[in-house]
Regions:
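Predominantly extracellular/luminal regions of secreted and cell-surface proteins
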Residues: 1-24, 205
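Aromatic, loop-rich ligand-recognition surfaces of beta-strand-rich domains
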Residues: 23-85, 100-143
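Exposed beta-strand and adjacent loop surfaces of beta-rich binding modules
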Residues: 55, 69-73, 173, 246, ...
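Beta-sandwich interaction modules
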Residues: 93-115, 122-127, 281-304
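Beta-rich interaction/scaffold domains
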Residues: 142-204
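Beta-strand-enriched, solvent-exposed domains that form extended recognition/catalytic surfaces
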Residues: 199-343
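Non-catalytic propeptide/linker segments at domain boundaries
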Residues: 289-390, 396, 408-410, 417, ...
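Catalytic cores of extracellular degradative/oxidative enzymes
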Residues: 367-556
């Protein structure tokens, strides 16, 4: 197993002494120490070892750190290159031990040989709360990690070597389950190595998760001129993952090299979340990204949720592809730019998948969650809070992120064909609603060939299953509209009349023009539009005419 061959304890500030004191630590009250911006040896910390060692990671304690870190830069020296510094690409993996104490693993993209290590830490967001490093453990590169890496033909772990058989993987799994004789603990990289072996078996059996081709047309970069900010650029990946779970996000691009920064972010969400703790983003690089799903809430229900990808560039010809290893598969319907038979076929396939999936959620929970040692999901099955009970439907102007059982139960019909037709009609009703609303804002893709500032947004709105605050039954927030369990039945609509005042009212909040918005008033214009045929309007046009021609300022 892993050999713990050096232990370093840091004193406060930038002391470089070993003090044999478990209560001391390195601290910097800043958001970056040279991991985001270019730093020098004056930044970070340097450890000189007693001799040269081969390693692929090291770990350190986070003390009582309140805010996480997500960036690390590593330089090293060895006998071969003397005083010439070397660099290695590294990822910072946030972990929690059995007592829920936070610690970090600094994992290199490949093993290195070093006699001196220099580490710089940081965040890719502005936060001046303290970064802290407690005891550091260096781990010598071990045979198990080497042997697991050796079954792959490439660094990104997308191809197996020809000699790999089922027994090869089974033997490695048996070794991985062995505990260290001295400590009784599993390998520090247990979750990551287990996922590597699961991926290997999926490759061997041709059952790997499909590749998701990113839509580069969906980007916030195109919508800055619109004057309203309630839009959402998330693209669903068909995965849900629990807090603390290890996942691998493999990013491919035809012209970029492994390790190069991708114009992509992974969005991690909390299922049935409060409005303030719905998501967190992780920047991605081309190649393999190892990610530990962060915990977004401390409340007493399952922790975790759907995963999404966001394209942050502005090039319609960009060609990113993404595969997620790990997590749990959930049904997704991607109707972006789909029309005619392609749309019909996609909806029918989704209905078939959803029917099978929703009937087995409780069973899947008991297999994957109730038996899980992680505190994140080790709960008795609760239909309204299980993170497996989720699905996404992405249209051009709207995305639904709702409980799978609620979506299924609200679709009318008995046969697959009847349900597919009813779902198509329900989704068309929402698409027609958004077309109506945007036309009244002067936005359309039908006006002229070069649509310019009058084009429809490239992003969509997002109606999400959320936890309500006191007195609310739905709400509009920065990039989503929150609905509770009883309102998560939008796929049962036969026309836009079925959406009602509330949904239109919240959509109005998110597409209200900032230049004239008066909260709870101007957004109701869209609610009036949606309900006027059935219920009339709360104003008459004669009064409107008198007001706008009166040369007076202020409300009517």
């Amino acid at each position: 197993m892993v050999q713990k061959w050096s232990e370093v304890l840091w004193m406060k500030e930038r002391t470089r002494e070993v003090d044999d004191n478990y209560e001391s630590y390195w601290i910097l009250e800043n958001w970056d120490d040279g991991a985001y911006n270019t730093g020098s040896l004056a930044n970070g910390m340097t450890v000189t070892l007693d001799q040269e060692y081969e390693m692929s990671y090291f770990t350190f304690g986070a003390v009582d750190q309140k805010t996480g870190m997500n960036l690390v830069k590593v330089r090293y020296w060895n006998d071969t290159h003397g005083s010439e510094e070397q660099s290695v690409r590294a990822q910072l993996l946030e972990k929690r031990d059995a007592n829920n104490n936070k610690y970090y693993i600094v994992r290199f993209s490949h093993p290195i040989t070093a006699n001196k290590i220099h580490m710089r830490l940081g965040r890719d967001w502005w936060d001046m709360s303290a970064m802290k490093v407690g005891e550091i453990h260096f781990h010598q590169y071990d045979d198990l990690e080497r042997d697991i890496n050796d079954i792959y033909a490439n660094e990104t772990h997308t191809t197996l070597k020809e000699a790999v058989k089922e027994q090869t993987i089974a033997d490695l799994e048996k070794r991985l389950e062995e505990s260290d004789a001295a400590t009784g603990e599993k390998h520090p990289l247990y979750s990551e190595l287990k996922l590597d072996l699961q991926t290997a078996r999926a490759l061997l059996n041709n059952t790997l998760s499909p590749v998701y081709k990113v839509h580069p047309e969906i980007t916030a970069k195109k919508d800055a001129h619109l004057g309203f900010t309630g839009l959402n650029a998330w693209q669903p990946l068909g995965k849900t993952a629990y807090a603390g779970e290890s996942v691998q996000v493999i990013v491919g691009h035809p012209t970029k090299q492994n390790g190069e920064r991708a114009e992509l972010q992974l969005v991690v969400t909390q299922q049935h979340a409060e409005s303030a703790s719905v998501s967190k983003t992780v920047n991605l690089t081309v190649g393999k990204n190892e990610i530990t799903i962060p915990q977004l809430t401390s409340n007493n229900f399952e922790k975790g949720g759907q995963l999404y990808i966001v394209y942050t560039g502005n090039n319609d010809a960009d060609n990113y592809a993404v595969r997620v290893n790990g997590g749990s598969d959930i049904p997704v319907l991607d109707l972006y730019k789909k029309t005619g038979q392609e749309r019909t076929d996609a909806i029918k396939k989704y209905v078939e998948d959803l029917e099978e999936y929703q009937s087995k959620i409780s069973e899947k929970h008991n297999e994957r969650h109730k038996a899980e040692t992680s505190n994140s999901v080790a709960y008795t099955y609760d239909e309204q809070n299980c993170i497996l009970n989720a699905t996404d439907i992405m249209m051009d102007e709207m995305m639904y992120s709702l409980p799978a059982t609620q979506v299924w139960n609200s679709i009318k019909g008995t046969t697959t064909d009847e349900k597919a037709k009813a779902l198509d009609q329900a989704l068309q009703a929402m698409e027609d609603t958004m077309t109506l609303f945007y036309q009244h804002k002067g936005l359309s893709n039908e006006a002229v060939k070069e649509k310019g500032n009058n084009a429809l947004p490239s992003q969509h709105l997002n109606i999400r299953y959320m936890r309500m605050f006191a007195g609310a039954f739905m709400y509009a927030a920065g990039n989503h509209i929150g609905v509770e369990w009883g309102s998560a039945t939008l796929t049962g609509a036969e026309s836009w009349d079925d959406f009602g005042w509330g949904i239109a009212h919240e959509i109005g909040h998110n597409i209200n023009q900032n230049s004239y918005a008066i909260a709870e008033i101007t957004n109701n214009y869209f609610a009036q539009l949606l309900t006027k045929d059935e219920k009339g309007t709360r104003f008459n046009y004669e009064d409107v005419y008198k007001k706008v021609t009166s040369v007076t300022v202020g409300r009517a």
